[in-house]
Structures are given as structure tokens and as C-alpha cells.
């Protein structure tokens, strides 16, 4: 059975949620749940008209494509809209263990894409957590991803 995702607004904050057994749970933190009649929340329109949206990056118009690394951690790539050709991957997978749910954290590949951090923050796709992890001679910044916005951009990416 395919999971159905919705965006929940609760106390001014949006959460990407999955619906199961009469309850909505946050995909990045399944212990956070919303039950109709018990909590005050609103199901938001996903605004899926963002699907073909492009972003300027390196003086090109590119499409953001969320995806997943083999261990379940989120990967953010940019591709050429007309051809679907991969342009670059904005994140790097530094996790050894499989993901639990859909993680709302990722490490930004500032080694190959020095502008990636500014790009993600500028377009409200992520925010800096302040945490850095060293791998080799590079300290990669961790970001908190805006999962509801990433879902709006590419709902099909979440059907894995």
C-alpha cells in the first residue's frame, strides 16, 4: 500500500506527515502525532504546482530533485529541467546507519558545491543547525530540511 503524505500546520509550524490508523504522524519524528479531535491542527494544501519550479544556480535555471541514498537518508540534487540530466548533488551522505523515517537533517556538500548552503537557505529549503561533521579535511554543515517544502516541490520523490 502506497503511503499518503499530507502537510499539517500546528502551532504555526508545518510538518510532513503520513496518515495511518486514524492518526497523522511526522515522518521525521514518528513519536510526534496529530489526532483529529484531540489536537488543534490543520491539513494544508500541498500546493503541488511547484513541481516544475526552477532555481537559479551557477547562472543556470535548474530543477531541485529530492531523492534518497541507499540507506534512506535524503539526497538533494539539481538537474537540467528539459533533459533531466543531473547537474550536481547538493548533499553528502555521511551516515553509517539506515535512516529512521524520513530524516529532516542532511549534510551539505560544501566541498564540491561551496554555494550549496547559501542556496538551500535562500530558498527556504533548509536552515543551518550549527553542527558540523568532519570527513577527511572538510567540515560539512548539517541542515534541518524543510520537508513540507521539499514535498511540495516533488511529491513523486516520496513514493519510494
Q: Where are the predicted features?
A:
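Short, compact, well-ordered microdomains
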Residues: 111-155
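Short beta-strand-centered aromatic/proline hotspots
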Residues: 15-17
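Charged, low-complexity intrinsically disordered segments and flexible loops
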Residues: 55-58, 66-67, 72-74, 80-89, ...
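Basic/aromatic-rich interaction segments and small domains that mediate binding to polyanionic partners
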Residues: 23-31, 81
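A short beta-strand micro-motif
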Residues: 4-10
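Acidic, aromatic-enriched beta-alpha/helix-loop junctions
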Residues: 81-124
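Short, mixed-charge low-complexity intrinsically disordered segments
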Residues: 31-43
